């Protein structure tokens, strides 16, 4: 159940239809598609808080930063109250997680519920 998720933190997430699904459909890697399997298809105002992290737009895979930026923009357009986007300058798809961990940690600290 998607409503049970406490927070979303995609690291360089592919938010259009995944490249493997597109390959199975006979599409090329640079042919963008959005269907029901794509996270972009499911953007809504009332989902969990989301921290979107991408590497440098010039170093990421196949326009991944632009996907992340569009994902973020759609959350803002539907009125989502807690969506954040970070672009990590100088980091590519392979090394961006290292720079993302402090952001992840801070996001969790800010959003976790205190259990007594």
Spans of features found by a protein language model:
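Primarily recognizes the serine-hydrolase "nucleophile elbow" in alpha/beta-hydrolase
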Residues: 1-35, 39
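Short, proline-enriched alpha-helix->beta-strand connector loops that line the catalytic pocket
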Residues: 3-6, 44-50, 78-82
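Solvent-exposed loop/turn segments at secondary-structure junctions
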Residues: 14-17, 56-60, 90-94
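Active-site-proximal flexible loops/turns
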Residues: 19, 45, 96-100
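Short amphipathic alpha-helix initiation/capping segments at coil-to-helix junctions
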Residues: 32, 61-64
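Short beta-strand/loop motif that positions the catalytic acidic residue
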Residues: 46, 51-55, 60
């Amino acid at each position: 159940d998607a409503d049970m998720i406490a927070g979303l933190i995609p690291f360089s997430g592919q938010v259009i239809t995944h490249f493997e699904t597109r390959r199975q459909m006979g599409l090329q890697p640079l042919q963008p598609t959005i269907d029901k399997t794509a996270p972009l298809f499911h953007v809504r105002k009332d989902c969990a808080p989301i921290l979107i992290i991408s590497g440098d737009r010039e170093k990421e895979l196949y326009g991944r930063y632009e996907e992340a930026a569009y994902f973020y923009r759609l959350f803002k357009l539907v009125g989502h109250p807690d969506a954040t986007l970070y672009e990590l300058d100088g980091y590519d798809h392979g090394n961006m997680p290292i720079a993302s961990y402090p952001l992840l940690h801070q996001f969790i600290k800010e959003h976790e519920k205190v259990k007594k």
